[in-house]
């Protein structure tokens, strides 16, 4: 039986010490001070990555100690494969993309995805291969500020898949600024005018990751949300009024773009709309998207949103509360498990603490957050970054095991991340 599955934590501590000693012996400290310090070769921590992941999912304390020096090198391997010469067949195979619909149920219910990205190339590839299926369609918005090398790498990957494309118009996206909303509108226009059929659209960013399978997502949509949009939110609370009553402008310090408040107060909402406040995440029907792109109220609301703070947290939920909008939910509140986020403001109340670190008041997950993530009822989790690569590596192995466990077609060998999985299958009901 694997040491990491042992019930006594003392065994895990011994394992951690043993691995550390082995790494130290393989990478002794240089006696030449000018050579600088050496670090354990991260690849040495990959003997049993699934077993370490299993221990992390089970919340074993010793596994957290091991994870501190086992920084998975997976990201650099992914980027290297993208830059290596070769054909698209090799790329899809080596990057473990699933190349066939996994069931008739999924094949007849195509989804559309809008993915906005600006950094973290390896994380984007991991996200894309987790949500990719050939019957779906994907619009990728690459931030206009992104480095040329990054844009080229994304384009080379996208070129290998007929149902993935870069948005026709790119924006310089600002945190809480209008251009994030505009970027998604641009993708919606492209999706509506594409040759692909799709029933619902889901928006993601490059630091998100699925915690439900494609089949799970479809069944969730078809449950109480059938033909309805999912836009969690409520009537704008008084504490949030300044976000829309005061104008905001975007400015660029040292290449970054931010939205900053002005002292000028703005006009009332168009058409006497009641403003709602909610999540920036959504699942929208195609008919609602077509409504957003053509309805006068939606267009006027978009113009009105150009200089408010965080317009994406007002725009979708406000329009989805209109009684005559397709698939609207006028009386809904915060219902809808779209994205799991640990907010700083909720720590100690509705959420346990962030085991990683907070950035912009939301948790960037660490290994200690994995048990909470996989128990969440949400479809996706946010947010992840390359500082803790093992988190996404573990999560995608767990997710792929679930995906293939639901498959109703023969599996291809390259759909697996390795020939034999050591992940604890009890984690995948």
Swiss-Prot record:
A GO molecular-function descriptor: acetylglucosaminyltransferase activity
GO CC entries: Golgi membrane
Keywords linked to the UniProt accession: Disulfide bond, Glycoprotein, Glycosyltransferase, Golgi apparatus, Membrane, Signal-anchor, Transferase, Transmembrane, Transmembrane helix
InterPro entries (alphabetical): Glyco_trans_14 (IPR003406)
Annotated EC: 2.4.1.-
Extracellular side: 26-429
UniProt family annotation: Belongs to the glycosyltransferase 14 family.
Name listed for the protein in its UniProt record: Probable beta-1,3-galactosyl-O-glycosyl-glycoprotein beta-1,6-N-acetylglucosaminyltransferase 7
Encoding gene per record: GCNT7
């Amino acid at each position: 039986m694997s040491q990491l599955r042992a019930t006594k934590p003392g065994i895990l501590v011994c394992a951690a010490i043993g691995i550390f000693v082995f790494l130290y012996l393989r990478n002794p400290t240089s006696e030449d001070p000018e050579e600088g310090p050496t670090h354990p070769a991260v690849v040495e921590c990959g003997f049993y990555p699934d077993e370490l992941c299993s221990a992390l999912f089970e919340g074993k304390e010793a596994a957290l100690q091991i994870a501190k020096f086992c920084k998975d090198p997976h990201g650099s391997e992914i980027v290297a494969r993208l830059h290596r010469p070769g054909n698209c067949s090799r790329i899809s195979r080596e990057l473990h993309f699933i190349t066939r619909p996994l069931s008739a149920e999924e094949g007849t219910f195509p989804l559309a995805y809008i993915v906005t990205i600006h950094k973290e190339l390896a994380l984007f590839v991991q996200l894309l291969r987790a949500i990719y299926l050939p019957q779906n369609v994907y619009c990728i918005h690459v931030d206009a500020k992104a480095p040329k090398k990054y844009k080229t790498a994304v384009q080379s990957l996208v070129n290998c898949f007929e149902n993935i494309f870069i948005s026709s118009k790119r924006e310089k996206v600002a945190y809480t600024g209008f251009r994030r909303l505009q970027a998604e509108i641009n993708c919606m226009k492209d999706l509506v005018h594409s040759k692909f059929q799709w029933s619902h659209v889901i928006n993601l960013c490059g630091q998100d990751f699925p915690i439900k399978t494609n089949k799970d997502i479809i069944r969730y949509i078809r449950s109480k949300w059938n033909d309805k949009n999912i836009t969690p939110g409520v009537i704008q609370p008084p504490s949030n009024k300044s976000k829309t009553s005061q104008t905001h402008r975007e400015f660029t310090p040292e290449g970054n773009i931010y939205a900053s408040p002005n002292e000028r107060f703005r006009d009332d909402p168009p058409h006497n709309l009641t403003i709602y406040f909610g999540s920036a995440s959504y699942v929208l029907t195609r008919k609602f998207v077509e409504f957003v792109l053509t309805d006068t109220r939606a267009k006027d609301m978009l113009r009105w949103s150009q200089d408010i703070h965080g317009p994406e947290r007002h725009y979708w939920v406000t329009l989805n509360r209109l009684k005559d909008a397709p698939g609207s939910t006028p009386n809904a509140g915060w219902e809808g498990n779209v994205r799991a986020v640990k907010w700083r403001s909720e720590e100690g109340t509705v959420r346990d603490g962030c085991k990683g670190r907070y950035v912009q008041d939301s948790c960037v997950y660490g290994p200690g957050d994995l048990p909470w993530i996989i128990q969440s009822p949400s479809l996706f989790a946010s947010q992840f970054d390359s500082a803790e690569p093992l988190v996404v590596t573990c999560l995608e192995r767990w997710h792929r095991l679930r995906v293939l466990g639901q498959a109703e077609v023969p599996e291809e060998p390259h759909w697996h991340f390795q020939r034999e999985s050591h992940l604890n299958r009890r984690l995948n009901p």
